[in-house]
């Protein structure tokens, strides 16, 4: 931009002999030539101003130069004459004040084109169109590639475990029972060697999905023809997977009434990580599923109850020896976390929330897990947050409250006098199907209600004793509840009095 007025108004000129002359006085009202910028009161394309005359050249939308001239008021003229370049717009302005119609001698030129300016106008639009088209085609090709790759991956068994690893760690003909018995006789007592676990995990063939929960999925699989259950955890539930694996591999943990652990492994397939927990397979499913479809007699009722509490008793008991077992509390006992074997006995499963007691240091080992137990089965001290988290016996007594509710579920399905109730969850008539903490707190803590007993129980000695037993398990005061060992002994006496061999 050229601002001519400043030099001609303020700086004097010198004659050739060196004498200086005064600057030419500036007209108070300046007349300027106007073109494309003439006010309404202009005459013969002449406008008047107390500021500057200007001439400007700029490109229109088609790229053609357009010349504009006219008057600029005194206020703000300096700013306008010092034209600030605008990106992607070519223009130039020159101003003057030395005489009337001085702007007719101004001939501003467009600034030179920069590299990027050559793509403006029609050529720019054409280039833009080509670029957008090419990018769109590339995007479509990338999406198609990803889609077909995804479909090809989906076509494979989702949880397939490769056979690429060496099988020499496990001799041909060895069964799972053989391997487990060998590991127990070796004296470790903590399950199969990790290398054997990984080999088994890689040789599992997934057959069908048999369950799904908040932690992940359960599949029925096969290893050398033997059926196994494979729990596949979501990656968000890694803490549960780690804790359950850790508990199952605790020394002296194996018990006939605790779900038999086989192997655990982490497998990465590139797009996702799979967390496996492989256990014994029990086709009857959970106690919850079993009770919904099966009615019981006194013997089968006592068998389910006795085997369940035997597993719980083993969990709760600390074993002192050179390779001792710590006391363990389950913290999420419910009928869905107990499985029914072919022989009608139960085993306890899902130890992802279990807590251990380290007696040497008097320390309660709580898992770093955001997951919480099932609200319907929570005891009053958990619901009202009065449970002493640093006292291990608090967790043991919380388990016993939950076990009392499980006894109620079992007893309702026992036939007496030709009568039996349909299966229901505890508190089914008092809270919604998915109760909130507030729902359970009101019923269990404030109103101190418990599941009701059918009238027929009072006329059946076995069911009457079961009712008494569960009442002592779910007492409001944790210190008043029976221990698992006490319940186990009571059920054994009941079976003996009924002449039932467990």
UniProtKB/Swiss-Prot annotation:
**Catalytic residues in the record:** 332 (proton acceptor)
Which species is the source of this protein? Mus musculus (Mouse)
Q: Does the keyword Plastid apply?
A: no
Q: What's the protein's topology in the membrane?
A: Single-pass type I membrane protein
Q: What is this protein called?
A: Bone morphogenetic protein receptor type-1B
Give the disulfide map.
Answer: 32-53, 34-38, 47-71, 81-95, 96-102
> Keyword Iron on this protein?
no
The coenzyme or cofactor needed here is:
Mg(2+); Mn(2+)
Q: Which InterPro entries match?
A: Activin_recp, GS_dom, Kinase-like_dom_sf, Prot_kinase_dom, Protein_kinase_ATP_BS, Ser-Thr/Tyr_kinase_cat_dom, Ser/Thr_kinase_AS, Snake_toxin-like_sf
What is the gene name?
A: Bmpr1b
CDD domains in the record: STKc_BMPR1b, TFP_LU_ECD_BMPR1B
Signal peptide residues are: 1-13
A Gene Ontology term for the protein's cellular component: dendrite
The residues the record assigns to binding ATP are 210-218, 231
Residue ranges of domain GS in the record: 174-203
């Amino acid at each position: 931009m050229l601002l001519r007025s400043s030099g001609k108004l303020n700086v004097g000129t010198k004659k050739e002999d060196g004498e200086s002359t005064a600057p030419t006085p500036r007209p108070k009202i300046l007349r300027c030539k106007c073109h494309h910028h003439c006010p309404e009161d202009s005459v013969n394309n002449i406008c008047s101003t107390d500021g500057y005359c200007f001439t400007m050249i700029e490109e229109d939308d088609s790229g053609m130069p357009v010349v504009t001239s006219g008057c600029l008021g005194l206020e703000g003229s300096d700013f306008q004459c010092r034209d600030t370049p605008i990106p992607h717009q070519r223009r130039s302005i020159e101003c003057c004040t030395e005489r009337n119609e001085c702007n007719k001698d101004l001939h501003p030129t467009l600034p030179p084109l920069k590299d990027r300016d050559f793509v403006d106008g029609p050529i720019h639009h054409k280039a833009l169109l080509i670029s957008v088209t090419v990018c769109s085609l590339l995007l479509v090709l990338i999406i198609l590639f990803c889609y077909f790759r995804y479909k090809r991956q989906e076509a494979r068994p989702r949880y397939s475990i490769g056979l690429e690893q060496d099988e020499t760690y496990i001799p041909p003909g060895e069964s799972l029972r053989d391997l487990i018995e060998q590991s127990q006789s070796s004296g470790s007592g903590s399950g199969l060697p990790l290398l054997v676990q990984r080999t088994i995990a890689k040789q599992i063939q997934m057959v069908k999905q048999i369950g799904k929960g908040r932690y992940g999925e359960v599949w029925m699989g096969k290893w050398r023809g033997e059926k196994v259950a494979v729990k596949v955890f979501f990656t968000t539930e890694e803490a549960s997977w780690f804790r359950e694996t850790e508990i199952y591999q605790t020394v002296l943990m194996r018990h006939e009434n605790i779900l038999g652990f086989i192997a655990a492994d982490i497998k990465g397939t590139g797009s996702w990580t799979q967390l496996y927990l492989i256990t014994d397979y029990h086709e009857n499913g959970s106690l919850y599923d079993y009770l919904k479809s099966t009615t019981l007699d006194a013997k089968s009722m006592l068998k389910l109850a006795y085997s369940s509490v035997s597993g719980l008793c083993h969990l709760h008991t600390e074993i002192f020896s050179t390779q001792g077992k710590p006391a363990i509390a389950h913290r999420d006992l419910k009928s869905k976390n107990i499985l029914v074997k072919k022989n009608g006995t139960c085993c306890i499963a899902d130890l992802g929330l279990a807590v251990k007691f380290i007696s040497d240091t008097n320390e309660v080992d709580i898992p770093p897990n955001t997951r919480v137990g099932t609200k319907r089965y929570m005891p009053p001290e958990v619901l009202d947050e009065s449970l002493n988290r640093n006292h291990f016996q608090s967790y043991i007594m919380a388990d016993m409250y939950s076990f009392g509710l499980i006894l109620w579920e079992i007893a309702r399905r026992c036939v007496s006098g030709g009568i039996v109730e349909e299966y229901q969850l505890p508190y089914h008539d008092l809270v919604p199907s998915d109760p909130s903490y507030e729902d359970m707190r009101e019923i269990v803590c404030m109103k101190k209600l418990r599941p009701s007993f059918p009238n027929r129980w009072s006329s059946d000695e076995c069911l009457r004793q079961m009712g008494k037993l569960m009442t002592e398990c779910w007492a409001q005061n944790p210190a008043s509840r029976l221990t698992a060992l006490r319940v186990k002994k009571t059920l054994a006496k009941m079976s003996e009095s009924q002449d039932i061999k467990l």
